[in-house]
A protein has these predicted regions:
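Tandem repeat scaffolds
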Residues: 1-193
Length: 193
């Protein structure tokens, strides 16, 4: 049996948790700065109202982890299986962060904010994203399938490819220049005269 930690209102600077286990640990209103969570076991860990600034979550094992009101700033997540996180009260926001090969399928991300982020090859299947904002976010190779994107804001997002036949996009906002990404599924040619 391992001892679990309970920390509240703490600042953790340059913590190297790579390859370690934080299984069952609880962190409330903590600020993590320049921390490394690469290949860290986060099973059952709880991060409630926490901020992650310049942190690395490459290949972190997130099964059963709770991110509740968590904010990621200038952080990196590679292979983040967010769909394996605890779903009750799951809420995250990202600013200036890089997310590669992450999976947000089946999650309720209503109102989530991705601001000045890079989301490459990420998956949003059967995801609730109504009212979400993808401000100044690069969505290269990201898949949206059978997701609710109603009232979502893609006005300053780039490189998205969203099939309107398999996603709800009513009242979503898109820029005229990037709206071509809504037509790719129809295999048509757009000519600029």
């Amino acid at each position: 049996m391992t001892d679990t930690k309970f920390l509240e209102d703490q600042q953790i600077l340059s913590g190297d948790f790579s390859g370690q286990s934080l299984e069952g640990d609880t962190y409330i209103k903590c600020q993590f700065k320049n921390c490394n969570f690469s290949d860290t076991l986060l099973r059952g860990a709880k991060f409630i109202s926490c901020t992650f600034n310049s942190c690395n979550f490459s290949l972190a094992k997130m099964e059963g982890c709770r991110f509740q009101d968590a904010t990621f700033i200038d952080s990196k997540v590679v292979g983040g299986a967010f769909f394996k996180c605890e779903r009750i009260l799951f809420s995250v926001n990202f600013r200036g962060s890089t997310l590669l090969y992450c999976n947000f399928s089946e999650l309720n991300l209503k109102g989530v904010h991705f601001k000045r982020c890079t989301l490459k090859e990420c998956h949003f299947s059967n995801t609730q994203l109504s009212g979400a904002s993808f401000e100044e976010t690069d969505l290269s190779g990201t898949l949206f399938h059978n997701s609710d994107l109603s009232n979502a804001n893609f006005a300053s997002a780039t490189h998205y490819n969203i099939d309107p036949r398999t996603n709800k996009i009513k009242h979503a906002k898109f820029s005229l220049l990037e709206a071509v990404g809504l037509l790719q599924a129809f295999e048509i040619t757009i000519v600029d005269l």
